[in-house]
């Protein structure tokens, strides 16, 4: 028990990507502070390639991100699968639907994040498979910019479920679950191979996994 206490005390530098950090942290920070009161958490936000470089150099202890090919060089601990929902403006022809078939996106142009965001690449993959394309007139710097562009009637987009509000419709945006297939990304905790603090990261991952268990079932039910 004393060893566990030592493992979960002291400073911990955690990196998070911008499309995860602001949306996941409110769910987990109070729980982590209560569960591991002696842990001093320092949070760093950057894009995937920057975080992995800082993890490799030792500037960061661990990183929470959407698992990608580049993270395979590290120890990956999957936390949860996060669905993506279609965000459309409130007077869009699909606004009263309960869900959207991915095949329905064929021929549509979707708003996307700018280069460097892994969510951009993942969303583009799902869109291309469905026969959709990118709206090349605009690339957003953040999910909030994307959301506001949708509210303004400038287009539609895929948003990760953590960024979706509890209501199916809010501030001029309607959120619809996508099916056949359901687009999603795997969020994981990543750390350096051979790290002496492996136990710390595994305990952290287990606590986050338990906290988020079943969370997206509720989100998708509310969206319908």
Label every model-predicted segment.
Residues 1-5, 204:
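Alpha-helical linker/hinge and terminal dimerization helices associated
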Residues 4-6, 33, 75-78, 94, ...:
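Short secondary-structure boundary/capping segments
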Residues 9-72, 140-142:
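Central regulatory/effector-binding core of bacterial HTH transcription factors
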Residues 11-15, 63, 87, 111, ...:
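Short, well-ordered beta-strand segments
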Residues 47-60, 65-66, 114-174:
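Hydrophobic hinge/microswitch elements
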Residues 71-84, 88-110:
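Flexible hinge/capping segments at coil-to-helix
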Residues 94, 109-130, 197-206, 211-221:
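Secondary-structure junction motif
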Residues 161-170, 180-224:
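C-terminal effector-binding regulatory domain of bacterial HTH transcription factors
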């Amino acid at each position: 028990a004393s060893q566990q206490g030592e493992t979960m005390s002291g400073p911990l530098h955690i990196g998070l990507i911008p499309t995860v950090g602001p949306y996941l942290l409110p769910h987990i920070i109070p729980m982590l502070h209560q569960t591991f009161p002696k842990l001093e958490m320092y949070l760093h936000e950057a894009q995937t390639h920057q975080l992995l470089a800082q993890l490799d150099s030792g500037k960061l202890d661990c990183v929470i991100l959407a698992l990608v090919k580049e993270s395979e060089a590290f120890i990956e601990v999957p936390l949860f699968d996060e669905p993506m929902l279609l965000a459309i403006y409130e007077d869009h022809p699909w606004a009263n639907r309960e869900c959207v078939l991915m095949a329905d996106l064929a021929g549509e142009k979707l708003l996307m994040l700018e280069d460097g965001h892994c969510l951009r690449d993942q969303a583009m993959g799902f869109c291309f498979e469905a026969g959709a394309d990118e709206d090349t007139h605009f690339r957003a710097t953040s999910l909030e910019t994307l959301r506001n562009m949708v509210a303004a009637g400038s287009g539609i987009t895929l948003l990760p479920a953590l960024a979706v509000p509890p209501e199916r419709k809010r501030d001029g945006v309607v959120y619809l679950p996508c099916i056949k297939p359901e687009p999603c990304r795997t969020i994981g905790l990543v750390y350096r191979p051979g790290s002496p603090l492996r136990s710390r990261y595994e305990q952290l991952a287990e606590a986050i996994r338990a906290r988020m268990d079943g969370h997206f079932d509720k989100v998708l039910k509310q969206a319908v």
